[in-house]
Amino acid sequence: MTLDLTLEDPRWTILPPLADRAISATLAQMGLDPELCEISLLGCDDARITALNAEFREKPSPTNVLSWPAEDLAAETPGGTPLAPEPDFTGAVPLGDIAIAFDTCQREADAAGKPIADHVTHLIVHGLLHLLGYDHIRDEDATLMEGLETRILGNLGIDDPYTME
């Protein structure tokens, strides 16, 4: 897999191994060859993610993770499976970009009483599923996406994040 990892915040020492593990597990679950996928991941702080959230979502507040899919793969029908990424015969298929904020992740993990590594892994899986066309706005889509997240995290030995809330 091609992972373009940018660490803007020095506290993100755990991000490289977590990203490799979470992305590999997600792509495997989705039946995608990691060697044919390209993802950009930004490890930042709350100030940076607040600016990104304001710019792209018009929400000037911190959030845990943001994603920008390279192409719209969303299913047309509620609860439907998104389209598969189109193969790129010249190299890796760019799936999109993910940004994740250390401060918010740490706060949320502490509040939930779970290890930050587990929470960050969940958020990387979550962000990557967004790049692959999954969403959680409609109830049927949320059920599908959360089920995939739970299955992928279970394969990594991480408890269901939705039963810990």
From Swiss-Prot:
<feature type="binding site">
    <location>
        <position position="136"/>
    </location>
    <ligand>
        <name>Zn(2+)</name>
    </ligand>
</feature>
<dbReference type="GO" id="GO:0005737">
    <property type="term" value="C:cytoplasm"/>
</dbReference>
<protein>
    <recommendedName>
        <fullName>Endoribonuclease YbeY</fullName>
        <ecNumber>3.1.-.-</ecNumber>
    </recommendedName>
</protein>
<keyword id="KW-0698">rRNA processing</keyword>
<keyword id="KW-0540">Nuclease</keyword>
<dbReference type="Pfam" id="PF02130">
    <property type="entry name" value="YbeY"/>
</dbReference>
<keyword id="KW-0479">Metal-binding</keyword>
<dbReference type="GO" id="GO:0006364">
    <property type="term" value="P:rRNA processing"/>
</dbReference>
<keyword id="KW-0862">Zinc</keyword>
<dbReference type="InterPro" id="IPR023091">
    <property type="entry name" value="MetalPrtase_cat_dom_sf_prd"/>
</dbReference>
<dbReference type="GO" id="GO:0004521">
    <property type="term" value="F:RNA endonuclease activity"/>
</dbReference>
<dbReference type="GO" id="GO:0004222">
    <property type="term" value="F:metalloendopeptidase activity"/>
</dbReference>
<keyword id="KW-0614">Plasmid</keyword>
<feature type="binding site">
    <location>
        <position position="126"/>
    </location>
    <ligand>
        <name>Zn(2+)</name>
    </ligand>
</feature>
<feature type="binding site">
    <location>
        <position position="130"/>
    </location>
    <ligand>
        <name>Zn(2+)</name>
    </ligand>
</feature>
<dbReference type="InterPro" id="IPR002036">
    <property type="entry name" value="YbeY"/>
</dbReference>
<keyword id="KW-0255">Endonuclease</keyword>
<dbReference type="GO" id="GO:0008270">
    <property type="term" value="F:zinc ion binding"/>
</dbReference>
<dbReference type="InterPro" id="IPR020549">
    <property type="entry name" value="YbeY_CS"/>
</dbReference>
<keyword id="KW-0690">Ribosome biogenesis</keyword>
<keyword id="KW-0378">Hydrolase</keyword>
<keyword id="KW-0963">Cytoplasm</keyword>
<comment type="function">
    <text>Single strand-specific metallo-endoribonuclease involved in late-stage 70S ribosome quality control and in maturation of the 3' terminus of the 16S rRNA.</text>
</comment>
<comment type="similarity">
    <text>Belongs to the endoribonuclease YbeY family.</text>
</comment>
